[in-house]
C-alpha cells in the first residue's frame, strides 16, 4: 500500500510548486491573526501599483472556533497555505488545478467545483470576488480576486488562493479527524496540537481576563494611531493586528454586546484604512522600488 502524503510533504510540495511559478517563499508572520490575508505579506502588499508574488503557511487563530480539541474539524488555530499574485496571471485557475495534480489529485478524475462565495472582511475594509473550491464535496480552498483592501481599490488585479491545510490533508490522507492526520515522520497532528487546542479553548471561553483585554484593546489602538502619526507603518500594523485578535478573544468570551461589536469593528476598520493609505504613501516616497525591479527584469 502506497504511503499517503503527510502534511509536511504536502506543504513542501506546494512551496516547490508556487516557488517555480515565481512566488517568493515567505515565513509565517509572528503576530496573531485570524487569516493569512491579514499578514502584511498580503494585506499591505495587495495595495499600490507594485508587483508581488508570495506563498507562505500562516497559522490562523479564531478563538470562537475553539472546541477544546474535541471536535474533529473545528479548531482554535488552523493553518492556511496562502498564495498571492499581483498582477494576477491570466491562467491562475489552471495553476491552481496543476498544484492539486502536484499533490497527486488528478483534476480529470475528481469532482472539482468553483462555488461562488464573494469575500468580505468588514473590520479590515476588504472585499473581493471569490469562489470556494470544492473537491469531491469537501471545501478545500478559497479563490479570490481582491477588489478593495484597507478601503483602497486594488490595482493591478491581485489574486489570492488559500488552501485549508488541515482540510486538504484530511482529504489526501482520508481521515475523519484532523487529530489523526500525520504531520510528518509518523508524528500525528493530535500529538502536537490537541493539548494546545484544549488549553486555548479553555482560556478563550472560560478564564480570559475581560477587564485586562478591554484595556489591552484601548492601549493597542492608542499605540497604533500614535505610530501612524509618526509614519511608522509596519509597527502600527502590528498593533492593528493585536487589536483584531484582542477583539476576537473578547467576542469569544461574550464580553461585547451586538452594539459594542459593531463599534469595535468600526474602530479597527478606521485604523486599517489609515494604515493602508500610509503604506502606499511610504512606498511612493521610495519610488515604488518593486516597479523598478520589474522593469529591470523585463
Swiss-Prot record:
It catalyses: tRNA(Gly) + glycine + ATP = glycyl-tRNA(Gly) + AMP + diphosphate. SUPFAM superfamilies: Class II aaRS and biotin synthetases. GO terms for cellular component: cytosol. InterPro entries: aa-tRNA-synth_II/BPL/LPL, Gly-tRNA-synth_heterodimer, Gly-tRNA_ligase_asu. One of its GO terms (molecular function) is ATP binding. Pfam families: tRNA-synt_2e. Gene3D superfamilies: Bira Bifunctional Protein, Domain 2, Class II aaRS and biotin synthetases, domain 2. Tetramer of two alpha and two beta subunits. This is Glycine--tRNA ligase alpha subunit. It comes from Lacticaseibacillus paracasei (strain ATCC 334 / BCRC 17002 / CCUG 31169 / CIP 107868 / KCTC 3260 / NRRL B-441).
Amino acid at each position: 500500500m502506497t504511503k499517503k502524503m503527510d502534511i509536511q510533504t504536502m506543504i513542501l510540495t506546494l512551496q516547490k510548486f508556487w516557488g517555480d511559478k515565481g512566488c517568493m517563499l515567505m515565513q509565517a508572520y509572528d503576530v496573531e491573526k485570524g487569516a493569512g490575508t491579514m499578514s502584511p505579506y498580503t494585506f499591505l502588499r495587495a495595495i499600490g501599483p507594485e508587483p508581488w508574488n508570495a506563498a507562505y503557511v500562516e497559522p490562523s487563530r479564531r478563538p470562537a472556533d475553539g472546541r477544546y480539541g474535541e471536535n474533529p474539524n473545528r479548531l482554535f488555530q488552523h493553518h492556511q497555505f496562502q498564495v498571492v499574485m499581483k498582477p494576477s496571471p491570466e491562467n491562475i485557475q489552471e495553476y491552481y488545478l496543476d498544484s492539486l495534480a502536484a499533490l497527486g489529485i488528478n483534476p480529470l478524475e475528481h469532482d472539482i467545483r468553483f462555488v461562488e462565495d464573494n469575500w468580505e472582511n468588514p473590520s479590515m475594509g476588504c472585499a473581493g470576488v471569490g469562489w470556494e473550491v470544492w473537491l469531491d464535496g469537501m471545501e478545500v480552498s478559497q479563490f479570490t480576486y481582491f477588489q478593495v483592501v484597507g478601503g483602497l481599490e486594488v490595482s493591478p488585479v491581485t489574486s489570492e488562493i488559500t488552501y485549508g491545510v488541515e482540510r486538504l490533508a484530511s482529504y489526501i490522507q482520508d481521515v475523519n479527524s484532523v487529530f489523526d492526520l500525520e504531520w510528518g515522520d509518523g508524528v500525528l497532528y493530535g500529538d502536537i496540537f490537541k493539548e494546545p487546542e484544549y488549553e486555548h479553548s479553555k482560556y478563550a471561553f472560560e478564564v480570559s481576563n475581560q477587564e485586562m483585554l478591554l484595556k489591552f484593546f484601548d492601549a493597542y489602538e492608542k499605540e497604533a494611531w500614535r505610530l501612524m502619526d509618526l509614519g511608522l507603518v509596519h509597527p502600527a500594523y502590528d498593533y492593528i493586528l493585536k487589536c483584531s485578535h484582542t477583539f476576537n478573544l473578547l467576542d469569544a468570551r461574550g464580553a461585547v454586546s451586538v452594539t459594542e461589536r459593531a463599534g469595535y469593528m468600526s474602530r479597527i476598520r478606521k485604523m486599517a484604512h489609515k494604515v493602508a493609505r500610509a503604506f502606499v504613501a511610504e512606498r511612493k516616497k521610495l519610488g515604488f522600488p518593486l516597479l523598478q525591479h520589474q522593469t529591470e527584469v523585463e
